[in-house]
Every structure is written in structure tokens, then in C-alpha cells.
Amino acid sequence: MEPLDQRRTDSDQEEGFGVQSRRATDLGMVPNLRRSNSSLCKSRRLLCSFSSEKQENLSSWIPENIKKKECVYFVESSKLSDAGKVVCECGYTHEQHIEVAIKPHTFQGKEWDPKKHVHEMPTDAFGDIVFTGLSQKVGKYVRLSQDTSSIVIYQLMTQHWGLDVPSLLISVTGGAKNFNMKLRLKSIFRRGLVKVAQTTGAWIITGGSHTGVMKQVGEAVRDFSLSSSCKEGDVITIGIATWGTIHNREALIHPMGGFPAEYMLDEEGQGNLTCLDSNHSHFILVDDGTHGQYGVEIPLRTKLEKFISEQTKERGGVAIKIPIVCVVLEGGPGTLHTIYNAITNGTPCVIVEGSGRVADVIAQVAALPVSEITISLIQQKLSVFFQEMFETFTENQIVEWTKKIQDIVRRRQLLTVFREGKDGQQDVDVAILQALLKASRSQDHFGHENWDHQLKLAVAWNRVDIARSEIFTDEWQWKPSDLHPMMTAALISNKPEFVRLFLENGVRLKEFVTWDTLLCLYENLEPSCLFHSKLQKVLAEEHERLAYASETPRLQMHHVAQVLRELLGDSTQLLYPRPRYTDRPRLSLPMPHIKLNVQGVSLRSLYKRSTGHVTFTIDPVRDLLIWAIIQNHRELAGIIWAQSQDCTAAALACSKILKELSKEEEDTDSSEEMLALADEFEHRAIGVFTECYRKDEERAQKLLVRVSEAWGKTTCLQLALEAKDMKFVSHGGIQAFLTKVWWGQLCVDNGLWRIILCMLAFPLLFTGFISFREKRLQALCRLARVRAFFNAPVVIFYLNILSYFAFLCLFAYVLMVDFQPSPSWCEYLIYLWLFSLVCEETRQLFYDPDGCGLMKMASLYFSDFWNKLDVGAILLFIAGLTCRLIPATLYPGRIILSLDFIMFCLRLMHIFTISKTLGPKIIIVKRMMKDVFFFLFLLAVWVVSFGVAKQAILIHNESRVDWIFRGVIYHSYLTIFGQIPTYIDGVNFSMDQCSPNGTDPYKPKCPESDWTGQAPAFPEWLTVTLLCLYLLFANILLLNLLIAMFNYTFQEVQEHTDQIWKFQRHDLIEEYHGRPPAPPPLILLSHLQLLIKRIVLKIPAKRHKQLKNKLEKNEEAALLSWELYLKENYLQNQQYQHKQRPEQKIQDISEKVDTMVDLLDMDRVKRSGSTEQRLASLEEQVTQMGRSLHWIVTTLKDSGFGSGAGALTLAQRAFDEPDAELSIRKKGEEGGDGYHVSARHLLYPDARIMRFPVPNEKVPWEAEFLIYDPPFYTAEKKDATLTDPVGDTAEPLSKINYNVVDGLMDRCSFHGTYVVQYGFPLNPMGRTGLRGRGSLSWFGPNHTLQPVVTRWKRNQGGGICRKSVRKMLEVLVVKLPQSEHWALPGGSREPGKMLPRKLKQVLQQEYWVTFETLLRQGTEVYKGYVDDPRNTDNAWIETVAVSIHFQDQNDVELKRLEENLQTHDPKESARGLEMSTEWQVVDRRIPLYVNHKKILQKVASLFGAHF
């Protein structure tokens, strides 16, 4: 067998990643290397060149911290270089050595030793690397010593190279020579590898050279870079190569750093060296001072990967250790050694089947039982996949391969075979993530911790598909509270599919949402979020208000409520009231740092702190929905809205918030997305309301006006109006409700003519001429019917119309007929009438049923255009009245009042918006008015330009301003409508109609004329030309443009006119719904009554229940439950409609076809497997028949029937030579491997001793194994009196008596008499691959005692806990600080002693005798051989396991035991030997040594307990 160092050199032309051996030096965690803000790292990505300052820092830091290796002693080697030159033992030529090495005075005459003659010096190769002629891509590189600390390398990569801490480490290993892969498999591998790296933020580590698997990885990254955008980020590919094997490495040497270093990829001239791959982003070039020696980087790569995997990465709000996975393509012996080391150290491996050689050999046998993986089978596979080099394999190598492959396959939980198109694996990324989850599941953790770790991985990588299939299974039942931290992480990182998954698996939002949770969510808003900046503004304003406060105000929920009120409108109340001092939230953050760094807070600790914290929220679903909406998270908001109860109001509120945010959003794309999402939520509100209205009109209309406590005591209708959701308001059900309100208690079937007749002759009300909606009104007294009629808004409206028309007629009469110096009675009546209008407008201004305050009501009042018009008309009337009452200004007063009459007439437009015919037309007119204003700007340009030019050409020095205005503006404007000026040319030129000097104020100044004054002096051709051009553009072009604008506006508005009219109709209905029934001026009586109620009686204002109704709790709960039920119907209908879409049907059909193909493939595989099983069964039957025939023949021969010569030779052969493969298979099926496993691990624990490989079939001593030559190892013990002598011969051991009790030492085996060969006892379980006694104390059996101390696990009430009906046990275990596993408190015993030494260390001495009594009274659960990694061919461990169970928690002996457990010992702690004891739950995942687990399982079985 080859030594370990030799096998490492065999990987010269292979890429392998080294996995650290189990005894490698432990490395501590890096302090403060994890940066909290990844955005700082992203600004320093690999494609960005260093600034001069950074280059200087790097040029000073690297030489101080990173070294290279140089040979300092030239010793001529017997070998020549490839060029035939003399080289040193290090491989470099004479010229490549430093001057000190050529003249070494210190080492003269000594043999070359790399440990002595290779020294470290500051590195001279680092910086940026650019590959000449290939691309402008800039990478990073560094040359460093093989002894460089992993901490330093990690610091270089993360702090100086600017790499983000990875979420995953992918180590790709395999063939270093170029090999062929099927195109489809190559494409799948490249796509999957880059996909998993890009989606998880992984680092890919390879050998970095431009050959083999490294080249495949580089090309995969190249293809991704060419096809992706800059936003998708970069794939970090790190090549770790040997400096001495790199071709053209001289180009990389720059003592002050290469910025950049130009490297040429020269494959033709590389010879036995290799070139760096141009598609890698970073290179770590490991230097040991030699040239041409491959594999130098493996130890450093091993340590670096191990170190990185021990770091903690926090992503998506969860903290996990950086997982590592090994991906294998092709490969040879070195790759096999790499896989073996990886599996041994617990690193999961993904084998790509179809890539060739080692990968295919392992993939072919991975599904077989270990007992079926024989030497002959491996030999057969090698002959198939290693055809060219199969003849070079020695028998020892084949045996070693068999043993390693058996050990690899034995740990199936770490082995994943990727097969193209099989096992549901569509891509390599799925296989990689499944491998990590499978490995995580196999770790020795208690159930919750293990599954929690798997879920962290899935959330961090955003792989909900794997979480569904691998984590949320029947194997583990999740508690909703366990999912809360992951739920928060999924929300913060915007992973809606995970939120949906958690909700499906029992997370209740009422329990999830607490004060702490909400604060955590709002503190983690993205800085780019508009709501984030609004919060900052609120906090800054509060800080300015509290000028005396030295500390910056901290974020609290009432700050959020302030911003939300701005968005929802002041008609809503604050959603989160300002807390009292004692209610101040525990999580808070200063204003400049609202963005909470998730890496700084443990979500698990957050939920531990908030356990039992009473939620303050009315509706937790609302809180999460608002949080999702303000960030414009579409899918997340949709999922949360589906959980809401008050869903119609929620959808309308979301629409309002989004529309308000879109107005302030500067990013156009984000603004459009917000508007689209607002429309989507409006459609959802319409959909739910439609379902409700179809089911029950009355209850649906109750939903519209129900006061929603959750949304600031507003109503659905009010939210829709605030959000201007015209589609919702124009819904038939809402319009029916508004019509119902409009008609009051009257039936809507009453014709308008009936209403008018009753208004003119109200006694008709007593005849049944008018029908009422409620039958009871039909039978009520006349006064009640009159009150119901005149309180109807429709009646109030028409009474006000009649009153208003009367007012306008009277006003016109006074202005035109009866406007006397002293006001007449008619004019006084107008004054009274106007006073009543003023009183009504004042009532509307101060009407505040919701308690919003005067300022807010004034703001709302003046936001309406018609109110502004009313106030303007009233103020103008007061101005005109003031002038009219002053005799000197009587006429100006009449003019003002005349203009005011126009404004009062315009008010009619608002009145007629209720009309279905006139209302839409009024809307169109309003929109066209906007077009006119834009048109006037264009028209003014032509009018002013032509008017000024014309006036300047025709008239000289006109000084009268009024005539300048007429000439420039007025005449030019009239010209558009056909009034062409006569003096523009000389045909109609006349001086009679003008004033020559401009002295006549009623005549224009004459144009320029000749000296006679009879002919024009201006150029007629010019003025005519200007006139024609002006008419062409102004009269034809601009007027037609205006017509086109009107036409476009008409068509655009006409499509939505009905919606707009229905939306605006509400305002008029609401106005007259709350208006006093009497029309002006009789309305003064109503105002007097109102004044008495408000001022004298102090009765507050109340809103009519028809528009805002606060329901009783029971009624509201029933109504919301009904709405929730119908919302589910709506969602189901939406889902059904989605499935019925053609594109969705095509996708479903495609998926079904793919599933069918997979099923057919699986069926074919099953049929093939079934055929093999049937053949095997047939073989077994034939063998049994042969044995039976042989028995018959033997019996007949013994009975004297024939000689038996030559009879049934087939049966005899079947009996004598049974099928070996069938026998092995049967044995494997019956008892697994059937042999010890841990005792055959190649690397012996606590020593760098490699065992001789022993495959399963060669374990029994009876099996012939001619090449078996195990090494001899016996460790020296400090106390030689307690161990057998050391020696590899039998002479020192001649005095030992085996198979008997030798003095105080019991050398008898529980398995009977064992064989002693050449003075050494032989392990009764077979070969182990190592002779001697190893680290054990005695040759032969080493007897141990394992006391299993158990008690029942009890809850707080004292009851026994159960799991899956079975009771749960707790066991007493111990642990050394250096150990990763716990152990039973037993072990080896000193000769003649009963208690193990380990047990004595944890028990106080006065309790030893009592515990011995407990042991004698205990139950023996196991006695026999222990499969321990310390076992050898000549020494092994046998144990007796005794169960000591305490049935009662109040057992006196149990209490005494707990009292006598050893306490903290400072001396032992200083030596690192202090043991810790703990009661742990008995479970199959308990982190216990494997052989102790088997014992514990027997104890659990003894008591019928859970395991």
C-alpha cells in the first residue's frame, strides 16, 4: 500500500479539493470579519478597478501579511528540465534562484530539505489580472505561501477584494485533463451550477486551470455572463492552483502589485504546466517554493474550505453556518481520494453520472447494498470506465478502491447521484440543494434543531419547491411558533412563496404579529422605499419639535400611523395610537438608521423575547398587508390579503395607499407598478362585493356603510371615494344603494312626475299616490308620511331647484327691471335669500360628525370646486351689495351684481350633474375646458406675434393703451372669426374713419400714408402676406387642432363618462342627504333649530346611518364572516378562471406529459429491477433444488442404494460451490454489512496512521487475503503500569495469558475463545487493517462498562411527555470540551475496579458505593463486542451496558444522584479536561457516539419508549 503523501502526488493531472482530516488543527472563528452591510461590498466588485488609494492600501497590506516561498539553497538535481537544463532539487533553474541561494555559506554540503531550505518572503505577485486578447474582464490574483493562515486569506477575499460572504461553498472536483461529456449533460451541468451559485450567492472553488473540470466551470460562468444582465450579479469563481505549475507566471510578478497584470493563455507552449482559466474571477496561487509539483494547493484548499464552512452567514434574516458541497465530474484516483475525504469529514457530495471514470463508477454502485459492492464488481466497473489505464491497476489499488467506495456508499445520506432526467431532478442545482438538505437531515441534532437548520437553508436560498418536497413532510410536525422566525425572514426578504407555505402549515397571523414583529418589519424597510423616506421625515420633524431632547427620536408605531393617515386621508383615524411611556416598544432604532441590519438581530431571539407578549393590534392581517403594500410587494400583498377578514375595505385601502404613493414616487416604473397594483386591488374589491351583492343585496349594502374599526373608523364607500375608485363606485350594487339613499324612504319606482305633483299638492300623499319602501309607512299617520316624503333627498333636491330658479328669476328681475336707488321689497327678499344660502354654506363648513377639526373640515370644504364657486359668488354679491348701498357707486354695484348673476347661473351645472343625460355632458365640458386653456396658449403666440407686427407696420407711435390692446389683441382675435380689417391694403384705404394724430379718443390712429395722405405708405404685399399666413395657421391649423383635441377628449371621456358620472353623483346625493328639508329662504328655520341644538342643548352632530353605520359586535362579526365566506368563493372562481385560460391549459398539459414520461421511465426501471429480482430468485431456487437433490443422493447412498459415483454432479457442485454473489446478497439483506465498520476506517483516530484497506468480503479471517499487510501501531501511554508492553513482536507479550482471568485483568471474551496467532490475539470480528493494540490499553478484549441512567421526561405539570403515543425518556450523558459528541458516563475500568474512570470523574467519591449498588440492581441490556474506531486486529473493546431507570421523579436515589454530580473543577477546566453532564431526551437524532446510540436504542425498546 502506498503512503498518504505518495497518493497525493498521484493527483498531478487531476483537480481535487482537499477535505481536512479529522485531526487537523482547529481554527477559531474570525473576529469581526463579517460585514453588516453588503452594499459596501457590492461597490467593490471584481469588475471594478481599484482606485489609486485602494491600490496603495493593498500594495502595503499584502506584502505585510502574505508571503511567498523561495528556495535559498541551490542543489543540483539528477533530473533535467524539459528544456534539458540543470535544475535544483526544487525544480527551478540556476537563473531562477535568488543570489543568496547560489552562494549559500550556511548550508554548504548539506542535503536539500524543503523544510530548511525554502524560506518565506513578502509576496511579489498580486493585484488585478487581465487575459490578453480574450476579454476586458478584470480578475484578482495573489501568490501566497502554502502555510498562509486561512484567516488572512478570508480577510483578503472579503475585505480587500470586496467579496460578499457566501451563502454556499461549492467545491468542484474531477478530472484535470480535458474529457468529453454529452452535450445535453454538459448543458445541464453548466446551467444548474451557475443557477445555484447565482441564486444562493455561492462561491465556486476549483483548481483554476484551463483544463478538465475547471475549464467546464469557467465556460459555464462565461455563458452566464454573456446571456445575463448586469442586474443579475456576478458568479464568484475562485481558482486555487499551485504557483509552480502555472505557465507564463512570470507575467504575474509585480512587487508593487499588477494593476492590471496582463496574462496570456498559451495552451500550445504550456508543456507539462497549465494555464490559468480566463473565466475565473479570482485566483489564489499556492507556493511551496518548488516547480512543476502538482497538488501543493490541496492542504491549503482543505483548510480554507473548512474555515469558510465554519463561518456564519446571515441571509434573509436567518443565520446559518456556510454549508459546503462537493460536486464531482469524471476524475481518477486523486478524485476518489478527494471524495473519500469529503464523505469522511461530513461534506455532502454530488456525483454527476455520465461524466465518466470515477464519477460513473460510484454512480453505478451507489444504489447497491454495501454487501454487494465486491472486489470483483469494482474490478468489472474499472475495466469498463478505465479502459485505457485498467491494465496499470495493481491488486492493492483495486482493493483500496473497493474499500473506499464501500465507505462512500455506506454514508448514503452524504451521497447524491445526479442522473439526467431521473428522480425528478431536472437540473444540477436541485441535486446540490437536495444533497445539502439530506446531509443536514442526517446530522445528529435533536428534531427541531435539525429541521430548523434545513428550513433556514431553504429560506436563505429561496427554494420553496425543495422545502415542500423535502422539509414539510409527514416525517416532522412543525409547531406554528417554530415557523415564526422563518416567517419574518421570508417577509423581510420578500419571498411570497415561503409566506404562503408557512400559512399553509399552520402559521396564524394573529399569533405571529406582535408589537416587536411589526417594529422589526418596519425597521427593515429598504432605504429606496418611499415610505422609508416619509418615516425619516416624520422622525426629523419630531426631533425638531423636541429641541430639548438630546437623543434622536426612535421609530415607534405611531410614527407609522402618521404617515398612513396622510396616505389614507384625514377621514380615517390613526391606526396605531401613541403609546404611553410604559407601552414603549422594546425594539427601536434611531432615525438615521431605520434600516435595521438583519445580520445584527437574531430572529430566534426576537421571538424568545416576545413570547407571551400581548398583541396590541385590532387586525394583524391588516398590519402585514399595509407593510407589504407600502413596499409595492405584489405577490406578498396578494397572499396576505387572501387571509384578511375585512377584505373589501382592505382592498380599497390598499388602492388608496398605492395611488397616493404613486403620486410621489419619482421612479416612473415603480409608479406605474403601483398604479397597476392599485387597479388590481380595486378589481378584487369589486369581485368580492359582486359575490356579496349576488347573494344578499341588503347585507352587501351594509358592508358599504359599516364603520370599520380596523381601518380608522371609516367605511368601504368612503375609502372608495377617497381613492377615486370609479369602477368600484360605478358598480351596479353601489349605484342601487345610492339610488336607494337618494329616494329616502320612498320607493324608487315612483315616477318623477308623481314627486313633482306631490310637491305642488302635498295632500296627494294621503291618497296612496306615492308608495313608500317600508309598508309600515303606508299605514302610518299623515304627519309621518309627510315627514318621510319631505326628508327624502330627491324631494329636497327638487325643492331646492325650484327655490334656486325662483331666486335666479327674482335676481334677474331686480337687475333688469327693479333696480332702484333705494332697495325694493323684491331686493330685500333677495338679501334674505342670499343670507339663507350663506347660512347653509356655513353649516356645511362646520358640519363635522367625525370630529376631524375645523381646519380639516375647511380644507375638505374648499377642496370642492363648487364650494369655491359658491363662496366666490357670495363674496362678489357682498362686494356688489356694498357698492350698491353707496349712492356714489350705485352703477358699479349693479355691474358687479350682474357679473355675480353669471356665477350663480354657473352653479346650475352642479345641480344637473344628477341627471343621467346632462351629467355626463357636463363632465365632458369640464374636460374640454382644460383643452381650451392649453389651446389658448398656442393661439396667444400667433395672435400676439401677428398683432404686434401688424400694429408696428401700420401705426406709428400709438400711445393710447386701450387702442394698442384693440389693435394687437382684439382685432387679431376677431380676424380669426372672419372680421378682416379693411385698412390692411390700399383698396379700401380711407382717412375718414381714423384720427391722423390719434387725438380723437373714439377713433383709431390712421395708418402710415404718403405725403398726400390719400394712399398708404406701408408695403401692402407684406401686410397681406402676413394676414394670409396668420389665417392659415390660426384659422385653419389651430382651430382644427382644437376640434381634434375636443374630439379626442370626447372619445376618451365618453368611454368612462358613465363611470365618472356615477362617481360624482355620490357627492350630490351625500350633500342633499344631509341637507335640511326646507329650501331657501325657509331653510333659515332649520338653521335656527340646528343652532339651538348645537349651542344651547350641546347635542353633537351625527352622521345619518344610511351612509355610516356602526354595527353591534355580534352583527358585525356575523357580517364579516359572511363576507369572508364569499371572498373564498371569489378566490376559487378566480383560480378556476386562471386554469381555464388557454396558456395555462397548455402549460398544464405540458406538465402532465412530462409527468407521464417520467412515470413511464420509472415503470421501465421498475420492470428491469423486477426482472433482475426474479432472476435472482430463480437462481436461489435452483441452488436450493441442487442442495435438496444432493441431500437425497447422500441419503440414498447412506441407505445402500447405489454407489453414488458421478450421480448428480450438478447438485454436488451447487452445494460445494454456491453462488458467491447470491450468498453475499442474502447476507447483506439479512444483516446489513454483517461486519464491523468503524474499526476499519482508513485513518486511525488520534494518529496519522493509515489502515490497510479491508473490503467487506475480506473481513473474516477465514477469507483468503494474500496481500493483507497491515501496519503495526501501538501508542505509548503515560502510565505504563496500566497497559500492556509496547512492541511489534510476541516476546514482550509472552507472559500474557489470553482467554483467562490473568490476575486482576479479565482477558476472556464474551464471544468465547478467540484465536492467538504468533503470540497476538486475533479480533473475533475479523480484520481491521491495523496490527498492534493501537491507542487501547490491553491486547485482546478491553472490557468497559456503560451505565445507562434514565428517567421519564416530564412536563411542567409533572406528567410524562409522549411522542407518537410512546413515552419519552431522558438519559444522563457527559461531554468533554474537545469532543463534538456526547457519551454515556462509562468507559474502561481499572483492573479489579467496578466503576469506570469517566464515571468517577462526574460523581463525588462518597456516592461511588451507592452507585455500585445501583449497577448491581440494574438490568443488563447488552454484553459483547463494540465496533469502535480504536479497535485493531489484536485489541478490541467489549462492553457491558446496564440500565438504571428511575421511574418516579421524586425518587430519593434520583435526587441523591443529581446532588452528587461533580461540580465545576478549576484545575480540570484549566487542563481542558472538565466534563459537563446533562439530561438529554432520548431520540434517534441525539448527538451521541454511534455505538452508544445502539445501546440507548435497546434501553428505549426495553421500556417501550420513544426513540
UniProtKB/Swiss-Prot annotation:
Residue(s) carrying Phosphothreonine: 739
Query: Using the chain's own numbering, where are the disulfide bonds?
Result: 994-1006
Q: In what way is its activity controlled? A: Activated by intracellular ADP-ribose, beta-NAD (NAD(+)) and similar compounds, and by oxidative stress caused by reactive oxygen or nitrogen species. Ca(2+) and PI(4,5)P2 are required for channel opening by ADP-ribose. Activation by ADP-ribose and beta-NAD is strongly increased by moderate heat (35 to 40 degrees Celsius). Likewise, reactive oxygen species lower the threshold for activation by moderate heat (37 degrees Celsius). Activated by moderate heat (35 to 40 degrees Celsius).
User: What is the recorded membrane topology of this protein?
Assistant: Multi-pass membrane protein
Q: Name one GO molecular function term.
A: sodium channel activity
Query: Selectivity filter: where is this motif?
Result: 977-980
**Annotated segments matching region Disordered:** 1-24
Q: Where is the composition biased (Basic and acidic residues)?
A: 1-11
Report the residue ranges where the short sequence motif Nudix box is annotated in this entry: 1387-1408
Acyltransferase in keyword set: no
Tissue-level expression reads: Detected in pancreas beta-cells. Detected in fetal brain cortex neurons (at protein level).
Any one GO cellular component localisation term in the record: plasma membrane
Which residues are listed for ADP-D-ribose 1 binding in this entry? Answer: 173, 178, 301, 332, 335
Record's function text: Nonselective, voltage-independent cation channel that mediates Na(+) and Ca(2+) influx, leading to increased cytoplasmic Ca(2+) levels. Functions as a ligand-gated ion channel gated by intracellular adenosine diphosphate ribose (ADP-ribose), Ca(2+), warm temperature, and oxidative stress. The precise physiological activators are under debate; the true, physiological activators may be ADP-ribose and ADP-ribose-2'-phosphate. Binding of ADP-ribose to the cytoplasmic Nudix domain causes a conformation change; the channel is primed but still requires Ca(2+) binding to trigger channel opening.
Reproduce the free-text note on domains from the UniProt record. Answer: Contains two binding sites for ADP-ribose, one in the N-terminal part of the channel and the other in the C-terminal nudix hydrolase domain. Both sites seem to have a role in channel opening, but the interaction of ADP-ribose with the N-terminal site is absolutely required for channel activation.
Q: Which family does it belong to?
A: Belongs to the transient receptor (TC 1.A.4) family. LTrpC subfamily. TRPM2 sub-subfamily.
Q: What is this protein called?
A: Transient receptor potential cation channel subfamily M member 2
